[in-house]
Structures are given as C-alpha cells and as structure tokens.
C-alpha cells in the first residue's frame, strides 16, 4: 500500500475509523511508522476531545441531578407542610369533637347524678316516714295516735317521694355524636399533585381599544377549576407583530386578576402599539404565557416647540407659562448690536434664554411682539385627532386652536386666515369667543375647566368641547389646504397640555350629529372685524 496516499493535511478532519484503518493497513516501514504515529496522535486527540465532551455532559448531568435533588427536597418540604396542615386541621377537628362528646357526657352524667341524689333523699325520707307510720300503729292512747296520724298525713302530703318524677331526664343514647368519614376518606384518597395550568388564549376579536382604555379578553383552552388567578403583562412598542426580544421597554405586570377580562384605563398612547400576554396561576405555580397579542394604540403625540415660541413664554414639553422677564437679557444684547449697525432681528439661537434648550427644531422665526404664541412640534396632515388643554385658574388671556406653518411671527391666533381658535379673556371683562381671519363670534357658553380640541383634517372640521362633559362649544367648517399645527397663545397665566389621546367615543358620536350645524368659519364672515 502506497504510504504517500495517507499523508495527513494540516487541520484535516480525520475520523477515528479512518485513523484506525490507516494504522491497520499501512505497510511496516520507516515512513509507515510516521504515518501510524500521526494517525495514532489523531486518535488520541479525538479521544481526548470526546472525553472532554463526555465529562462536560457528566458535569451537566450532575448539575441537573443536583437541581432535581434540591427541587425535590423543596417539594417534599412543601408536601410535608401541606400534610402537616391537614393533620393539624384533623387534630383540631378531632379535639373539638372529643370536647363535644365529653361535654355531652358530663351534661348527661350531671343530670343523672342529680336525679339519683334527689331519689336517694326522697327514698330516705320515705323510709323514715314508713318506719314512723309503722311504729304509730302500736300507739294505744287515742289522743297520741290521732296526733301521730295527723303528723303522718302532713308529712306524706309534703313528702318529695310523691312529687318526684320517676322518668330519667336524659337517655344513655349518644348516637347523635357518631361520625361517618367515609366520604371524606374518599376525598382524601383523591388528593393529587396540582397540574400546571395551560396557557390562556387571548381573543383579539373580543379585545377593545377605545377612549384611551384597552380591554383584553382571554379564555382557557379547557375548563380548569384549579385556577386561582391570572397575571396580565403589557408593554408599549412601536413595532407591529410579535414582541421583540430586545424591545427597549419592560413588561408591566398586573397580578391577581380573578376574571378572564381586564381593562386598563387612563392610558397615554405615546406608542403605536401595545403588546399583551397573560398566564394562569393555580395555588402552586404559574403556567406558560399565552401567545402575545399586539394591539394598535394610535393617537396624536406632540410636544410644544420651544424653538419658535415667544421669549416671554416659559415652554416645556406639555406646558407653557407666561414669563414677563423672559428675553430681557437678549433684548439688551440685540439693542447693543443695533447700535453697532448690526441687524436687530433675533435668530432662534441668539434669542434662546439661558434656561431654554438650544433651538434644535428652529425651522421658522421665533414669535415676537404681542404674539405670545407657541406651536406644537408635529404637523397634522390627515386623519382625526384630539387633545386637551387646561388653563391655570388665574390665567388672564389665552387661545387654543390650530394654524398653518406659515403663520407669521407677529401674527396672533385667529387674526389671520391661516389660523383658527377659541379665545378666553378674563382681563377687565370676561369674553369667550371663536376667532378666524380677524373676525370674532361670541360664545354664549360657560368657559370649561378643560377644553378638548378635535381636528378632522380630511373632513375640514375643527371643533372645541368641554373636555369633561363633552358639550360642543364651537365648530369650524373649512378646507385645510396645508398641514396644520396645534397652536396656543397665553398671557399672564399658563396652559397644560394632554396628548396621546384617542378621539373620545362621545366626540365621534357628536360629530355625526353636529356636522350640519351652522357654527362654522363661514359664519364669521358677517362678524365685525376687531
């Protein structure tokens, strides 16, 4: 056999069978010895690797065995506790029943002992009376005999023997305290280990997303009366479909749910979707999770754009407050630059106050003059949307509405044909009005604590509601030709904003019935211009 045919290449994967074949079939010689040594070395290396693999597997088995022993010990301890609890209950019941029997025995014994004592006394008195009467028969003196006879008559009349009941007050029957635990023994014989609950099944058809609430409904694949409660877990996500393992949000847990339905209310929908999963629990253990379900939670989310807001407004993401000192330092800097012949028009970067973050969204000029305005940072280009605004109690003047992006930096909401709003004025005289294109319509309704804004971009409708009662305050009917931004004006006070809200069901219902009302933007054409 040609030994050159069996030269091993470096890193060649040589099986044990091939190496053994080479050792067995190579002709003895100087070169063949080297090949046999190399083949044997391959066998040794393969055996060593296999030994390591087997040893690792043995270690795994030992670890598993240790886990079985530890878990079995824990389960046995729990089993002992459960049976000790049963024994304790049985001992308590036994002790209680023994006490009942002993009490009944003592009661009857006392009654019978009392009767025996009474009878003994009556018998003793009767025997004395009998002996006295017998002796009286031997009295010869008539007067003495007559006296004794009267005494005997009186004593007989008063004798307890004639008033004594000769019927036992109690019987010796104790059968009312007998027991028969055959049924309980049968129940005890049916004791067995609790099964692990099966995974519930969430029914997407029965789940409901409405009014910033989510109702999740599920069912068990088969009836299981051992289930004690359910655990519902949910998390927000921006990904459709199955939950991602590396999703950045953690599961939130709702425990101890007794039914097969649960409603989460008062949610802020600041993500596109929510994942849900549920598991059933019996007294011992929780079962597997259900297949996760992803529900859409679509809503308009936006913050206030502090990069273009008026310098006299202190703006945070969801609140704005009048700040009369805002921008004064910037104004003095601007005036100084004007004296040097430089332009006095402030850029967003130049006008950002010290406490205000840099103008990262600044795609437009900052509002100035008497336009104490701040816009939302998200444009509405289609669909129906809803948000709510609440004013501080001491707020002197504010406006709530929408505007095109082209709203000028000196323009006030409602005074141009590119903005629509309702305006509240509590300064000097109280007014509540709808404004558009510099025209005003007074509203004969009470200013609500919180205002709900409904914008139907495609339908060309902007409506304002009492956010609490859902009473319609006013509705503009128009045709939006550009994307609109939520707009807010405030003077001497502040506003807080609620976003991530679905269009309330009550508003949707009212929209269907109010689409024909006359309170529209066209009705402002005949109103006196301010």
From Swiss-Prot:
Residues 102-141 form a coiled coil. Residues 137-194 form the COS domain. Residues 300-506 form the B30.2/SPRY domain. Residues 342-354 have a biased composition (Polar residues). The keyword Acetylation applies. The keyword Coiled coil applies. It holds the Pfam family fn3. Keywords: Acetylation, Coiled coil, Phosphoprotein. The modification Phosphoserine is found at residues 520, 523. Residues 196-300 form the Fibronectin type-III domain. InterPro entries: B30.2/SPRY, B30.2/SPRY_sf, Bbox_C, Butyrophylin_SPRY, ConA-like_dom_sf, COS_domain, E3_ligase_FN3/SPRY, FN3_dom. PROSITE patterns: B302_SPRY, COS, FN3. Residues 330-341 have a biased composition (Basic and acidic residues). This is FSD1-like protein. It comes from Homo sapiens (Human).
């Amino acid at each position: 056999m040609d030994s050159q045919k069996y030269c091993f290449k470096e890193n060649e994967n040589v099986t044990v069978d091939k190496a053994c074949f080479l050792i067995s079939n190579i002709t003895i010689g100087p070169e063949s010895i080297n090949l046999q040594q190399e083949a044997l070395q391959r066998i040794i290396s393969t055996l060593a690797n296999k030994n390591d693999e087997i040893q690792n597997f043995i270690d795994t088995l030992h670890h598993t065995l240790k886990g079985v022993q530890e878990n079995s010990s824990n389960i046995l301890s729990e089993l002992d506790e459960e049976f000790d609890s049963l024994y304790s209950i049985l001992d308590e019941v036994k002790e209680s029943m023994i006490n009942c029997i002993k009490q009944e025995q003592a009661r009857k014994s006392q009654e019978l002992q009392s009767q025996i004592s009474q009878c003994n006394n009556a018998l003793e008195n009767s025997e004395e009376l009998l002996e006295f009467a017998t002796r009286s028969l031997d009295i010869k003196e008539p007067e003495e005999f007559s006296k004794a006879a009267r005494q005997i008559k009186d004593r007989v009349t008063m004798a307890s023997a004639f008033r004594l009941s000769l019927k036992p007050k109690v019987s010796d029957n104790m059968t009312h305290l007998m027991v028969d635990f055959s049924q309980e023994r049968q129940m005890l014989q049916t004791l067995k280990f609790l099964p692990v609950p099966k995974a519930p099944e969430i029914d997407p058809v029965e789940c409901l997303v409405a009014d910033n609430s989510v109702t999740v409904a599920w069912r068990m694949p088969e009836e299981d009366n051992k289930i004690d409660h359910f655990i519902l877990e949910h998390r927000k996500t921006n990904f459709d479909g199955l939950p991602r393992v590396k999703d950045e949000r953690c599961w939130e847990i709702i425990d101890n749910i007794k039914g097969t339905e649960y409603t989460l209310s008062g949610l802020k929908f600041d993500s596109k979707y929510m994942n849900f999963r549920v598991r059933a629990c019996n007294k011992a253990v929780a079962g597997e999770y259900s297949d996760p379900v992803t529900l859409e939670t679509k809503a308009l989310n936006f913050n206030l754009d502090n990069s273009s807001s008026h310098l006299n407004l202190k703006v945070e993401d969801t609140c704005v407050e009048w700040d009369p000192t805002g921008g004064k330092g910037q104004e003095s800097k601007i005036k100084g630059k004007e004296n040097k012949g430089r332009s006095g028009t402030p850029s967003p970067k130049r006008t950002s106050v010290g406490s205000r973050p840099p103008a990262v969204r600044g795609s437009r000029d900052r509002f100035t003059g008497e336009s104490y305005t701040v816009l939302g940072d998200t444009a509405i280009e289609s669909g129906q949307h809803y948000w709510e605004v609440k004013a501080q109690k001491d707020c002197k003047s504010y406006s709530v509405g929408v505007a095109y992006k082209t709203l000028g930096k000196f323009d006030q909401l409602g005074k141009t044909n590119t903005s629509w709003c309702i305006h509240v004025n509590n300064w000097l005289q109280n007014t509540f009005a709808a404004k558009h294109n510099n025209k005003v319509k007074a509203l004969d309704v009470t200013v609500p604590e919180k205002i709900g804004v409904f914008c139907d971009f495609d339908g060309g409708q902007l409506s304002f509601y009492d956010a609490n009662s859902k009473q319609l305050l006013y509705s503009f009917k128009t045709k939006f030709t550009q994307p609109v931004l939520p707009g807010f004006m405030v003077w001497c006070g502040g506003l807080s904003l609620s976003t991530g809200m679905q269009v309330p069901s009550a508003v949707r219902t009212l929209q269907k019935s109010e689409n024909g009302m006359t309170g529209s933007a066209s009705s402002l054409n005949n109103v006196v211009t301010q």
